[in-house]
Amino acid sequence: MRIGHGFDVHKFGGEGPLIIGGVRIPYPQGLLAHSDGDVALHTATDALLGAAALGDIGKLFPDTDSAFKGADSRALLREAWRRIAAKGYRLGNLDITLIAQVPKMALHIPQMRVNIAEDLGCHMDDVNVKATTTEQLGFTGRGEGIACEAVALLVRTS
């Protein structure tokens, strides 16, 4: 078994859309990023790549490459997962924590889990997404952006 950890932060800005966990969330701003800014999927991708010792999302999909400008983070996650599975791993579980004062995430979490499980070809019970605030402290508490952490467990299949 192998464990990986992911962390990402994006600042609010622009008109959107705001996409988290592959879900469009109604909010007046999006997240500033080279790709679509999906902080949850970026974090999940980093945790999975780390567990497989395949580097990180920036190594695989550099923000200096115009091919990834505005990229769909679900497509990036699927490509990372293809490489991980090719190394002989399956998902044990993935646990994601969104850290944001706004917007509220609870209503969107079930669909996030469905999207991620679909992209990883696993059961929804293998994917957990939760959200918390920082009680109005720091940049997330001031509503300036969103942070996210994830932990992934991979199990060798071959």
From Swiss-Prot:
It holds the Pfam family YgbB. 4-CDP-2-C-methyl-D-erythritol 2-phosphate binds at residues 8-10, 34-35, 56-58, 61-65, 100-106, 132-135, 139, 142. HAMAP family: IspF. Belongs to the IspF family. CDD domains: MECDP_synthase. This is 2-C-methyl-D-erythritol 2,4-cyclodiphosphate synthase. Its cofactor is a divalent metal cation. It catalyses: 4-CDP-2-C-methyl-D-erythritol 2-phosphate = 2-C-methyl-D-erythritol 2,4-cyclic diphosphate + CMP. Homotrimer. Keywords: Isoprene biosynthesis, Lyase, Metal-binding. Binds 1 divalent metal cation per subunit. The gene is ispF. It comes from Sodalis glossinidius (strain morsitans). Signal peptide: none annotated. The keyword Glycosyltransferase does not apply. It comes from the Bacteria. The record marks H34, T133 as: Transition state stabilizer. The keyword Acetylation does not apply. Involved in the biosynthesis of isopentenyl diphosphate (IPP) and dimethylallyl diphosphate (DMAPP), two major building blocks of isoprenoid compounds. Catalyzes the conversion of 4-diphosphocytidyl-2-C-methyl-D-erythritol 2-phosphate (CDP-ME2P) to 2-C-methyl-D-erythritol 2,4-cyclodiphosphate (ME-CPP) with a corresponding release of cytidine 5-monophosphate (CMP). SUPFAM superfamilies: IpsF-like (SSF69765). A divalent metal cation binds at D8, H10, H42. PROSITE patterns: ISPF (PS01350). Its EC number is 4.6.1.12. One of its GO terms (molecular function) is 2-C-methyl-D-erythritol 2,4-cyclodiphosphate synthase activity. One of its GO terms (biological process) is terpenoid biosynthetic process. Transmembrane segments: none annotated. InterPro entries: MECDP_synthase, MECDP_synthase_CS, MECDP_synthase_sf. Pathway: Isoprenoid biosynthesis; isopentenyl diphosphate biosynthesis via DXP pathway; isopentenyl diphosphate from 1-deoxy-D-xylulose 5-phosphate: step 4/6.
